[in-house]
């Protein structure tokens, strides 16, 4: 494509990537964080885009006037990779910009760091895509998805064989959720993460948001952010959120749209391939970074003994953050959903690839019982093309529980 757009929530490292990636050296670089360069582009976008040298434009969404001129220049002279754009908003959700670049740009999302990156595990293939390929549609392994693949022992909580996993990744520690995946925080570049998160929030509200839309009441918008953080990992009930934020539903919906456009939240669609009228069709609300969600929700302690009511939802948000990064980089044809039968069963994540899928139920604790498997059993019974239903727990045992049913460590699933 003549244009490549790299987008993502602010502070994920887009500018660092554009400036320091060796393969991008030698390109002409402008940033619309520089007011002089922004004003020059507004006055004469054609002049900025002319020339044969490859051009990188950082924070491109700040100059909407650029995109019509960009379309004309691409149509005049198409050359792969000629323009590289970055932005802290989802250009696909901005109608005028997405329509202008239709058929002329490819979009890439730079997600917050996932655990594989933080632990330096990116030299190996991720586990989940490998598991999906290793399982036949019936759920029977074509080849072992585990290192070694041998049975360690019979027994365990369900008298099923445990599988050997060589050097399994460690369980997820509470501090991993509180830090999240923003590079400066999760890589230990800041001494006090709480100060960084407060600065992020202030900059987002006072600069990024104002550049995206006219929001008259920033206090009300911040209240919606906080109410949304308290609901991460849960089905979105907009009228209830609006009531708690003391706003009408229309204003609340507009604010949620702005949060989604700027990559602060995502709305996970429901999986609707099952033949039942009782399926929940409303999306699930998820923050794209679990650390930001915990900060906005005021969560300070996620130890099991703390009895934090959001603990399970924040673990689910952490898994979603990791899945988003892994699927984007290694399994782009996969689609992420959740499944809910009204008033009865919910499966936290369904990864769909063509007609086949894998279902994941997230358990924040290390212990689990038969009751935790009920949603997966129901989903497997209604979805014959699901290759595996996996109870993802924060322990270390990998257990095969029967046809298409597994209990696997969260550290392994996200490795």
Predicted regions and their residues:
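Domain-level recognition of nuclease-like catalytic cores that cleave nucleotide substrates
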Residues: 395-415
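Accessory nucleic acid-recognition modules appended to NTPase machines
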Residues: 186-357
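P-loop (Walker A) phosphate-binding loop of NTP-binding proteins
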Residues: 9
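Hydrophobic positions on the alpha1 helix immediately C-terminal to the Walker A/P-loop
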Residues: 17
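Conserved nucleotide-sensing/catalytic segment adjacent to the nucleotide-binding pocket
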Residues: 40-84
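Hydrophobic anchor at the beta1->P-loop junction of P-loop NTPases
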Residues: 6
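Conserved lysine of the Walker
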Residues: 14
